[in-house]
């Protein structure tokens, strides 16, 4: 059996740019890509916490340390500057690998300040 698992997640980053006329993609600070283990040109899903829209694109690197999250091309219709989004990538693996897998998660606050990283999603409690 093959499973699709969360590979990396940028939790609650703020969109800093939305450029309808740029050639597609989402530009992400290279430090953020590294923290989540997301590669340039990798497929990503973006879930807009602010407006509820969900869309797919691919990651490109923005300048390291810039804190840039730039939603580009047609996807710019799905996010505005200031929106809070979650960016995720996924990986496929065997059932055996999946049972040992730990994702790369980075948590953000304020103006894209990375507060911490983790290798698991916390258990939700009642």
Swiss-Prot record:
Keywords on record: Autocatalytic cleavage, Cytoplasm, Decarboxylase, Lyase, Pantothenate biosynthesis, Pyruvate, Schiff base, Zymogen
Active site per UniProt: 25 (schiff-base intermediate with substrate), 58 (proton donor)
One CC-aspect GO term: cytosol
Entry's Gene Ontology BP terms: alanine biosynthetic process; pantothenate biosynthetic process
EC number: 4.1.1.11
Record-linked InterPro entries: Asp_de-COase-like_dom_sf (IPR009010), Asp_decarbox (IPR003190)
Domain of life: Bacteria
Biological pathway: Cofactor biosynthesis; (R)-pantothenate biosynthesis; beta-alanine from L-aspartate: step 1/1
List of residues binding substrate: 57, 73-75
CDD domains attached to this UniProt entry: Asp_decarbox (cd06919)
Top EC class of this enzyme: lyase
Signal peptide boundaries: none
SUPFAM superfamilies: ADC-like
Reaction(s) catalysed (UniProt annotation): L-aspartate + H(+) = beta-alanine + CO2
Annotated cofactor note: Binds 1 pyruvoyl group covalently per subunit.
Residues bearing the modification Pyruvic acid (Ser): 25
Cofactor(s), by name: pyruvate
Modifications the protein undergoes after translation, according to the UniProt entry: Is synthesized initially as an inactive proenzyme, which is activated by self-cleavage at a specific serine bond to produce a beta-subunit with a hydroxyl group at its C-terminus and an alpha-subunit with a pyruvoyl group at its N-terminus.
PANTHER family linked: ASPARTATE 1-DECARBOXYLASE
NCBIfam families recorded: panD (TIGR00223)
Family, similarity comment: Belongs to the PanD family.
Subunit composition and interactions: Heterooctamer of four alpha and four beta subunits.
Function, in words: Catalyzes the pyruvoyl-dependent decarboxylation of aspartate to produce beta-alanine.
Protein name: Aspartate 1-decarboxylase
Name of encoding gene: panD
């Amino acid at each position: 059996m093959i499973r699709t698992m969360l590979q990396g997640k940028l939790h609650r980053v703020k969109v800093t740019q939305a450029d309808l006329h740029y050639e597609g993609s989402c530009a992400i600070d290279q430090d953020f890509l590294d923290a989540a283990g997301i590669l340039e040109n990798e497929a990503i899903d973006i879930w807009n916490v602010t407006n509820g829209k969900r869309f797919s694109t691919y990651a490109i690197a923005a300048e390291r340390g810039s804190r840039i999250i730039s939603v580009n091309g047609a996807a710019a219709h799905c996010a505005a500057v200031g929106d809070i989004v979650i960016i995720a990538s996924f990986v496929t693996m065997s059932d055996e690998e999946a049972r040992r897998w730990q994702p790369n998660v980075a948590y953000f606050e304020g103006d894209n300040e990375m507060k911490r990283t983790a290798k698991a999603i916390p258990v939700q409690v009642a």
